[in-house]
Amino acid sequence: MLSAAQLRGTQQRRRSPYSDKQYYQEYILQRIEGYKNSIGRDELLRLGDEAATELQTAAEGQFLLTEVLMLESVDRLIMKRLSLRPYSKWRRQFLKVREAQRTPTHWGLEPACPLARLLPRIEPRDVTLVIGSGAEPAAYLLAAHDAVVTFLAGDLGCVERVESRITAEGLGSLFEAYVAQTGPCLPEFVDFGDALGLVVLDPGVLAELSATCRMEFVADLQRLSRPGGVHVVLPSCPSLAPEALLAFYDGWAVEEDGRRRRRGGLARRPEGLVLGCPLCPPDTTREASTAS
């Protein structure tokens, strides 16, 4: 994820965006895997027999059937059954759909919401974490921008709903969702593979926790975030305002929106907090030696 300074500068992005061909290959693979998961074992075995027969007939016994050839042949048969569109037809529709998916309003978010302001800074495969049912739309929006998204919620129904829509929208290639109750730290089974560039938090997941537990949870999120990373705290919980968590972000910078005031100086409706992790962590060793 780019910093605000990098976005304003001329620095090139660290990662190139996906090509349309890559998106098409993902589309094909997702449809094939979805079909395999939707049929029973007997039907899958019949597909394998049909593929083996076709290979033997075409090659007239000139080569040995390998597992790779069999898998490729089965995939081709599934593509025929599904009547998947060729690349040229698929691309025309895909570009329109993806353009819509990348707008906040497509997911019910305000155009000027905190996450919308960060979208120009997001790069493909940025590692992001979205926590809480109130942050559900953020998971869709980030997935549409090719971020690696992990979604956590305490409600199984919410997680299943998000997984279903992600699949239906064709956004599931870099998406994982887990049922997880909020505690002093994130569950051990959640593995991000890299430091977090962006965290979107619905403070409602902290509403029932003690102040100490909230502090420990936020500290764990900070520990997992990379220098220069960003946390967005949404105004999604009536009983716990984003500002109530500010005390846990000592040393982090509050990123203000220059458009937060309307004409005449009237304050806009609260939209949440955007907090930036310092690029250089404090030198705790030096502080300890000074104190001693």
Locations of the language-model features?
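Class I S-adenosyl-L-methionine
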Residues: 239-292
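N-terminal accessory regions of S-adenosyl-L-methionine
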Residues: 1-106, 286-291
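Conserved beta-strand signature within the Rossmann-like core of class I S-adenosyl-L-methionine
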Residues: 227-237
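Conserved alpha-helix/loop element of class I SAM-dependent methyltransferases that forms part
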Residues: 106-126
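A short SAM/SAH-binding and catalytic strip from SAM-dependent methyltransferases
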Residues: 193-213
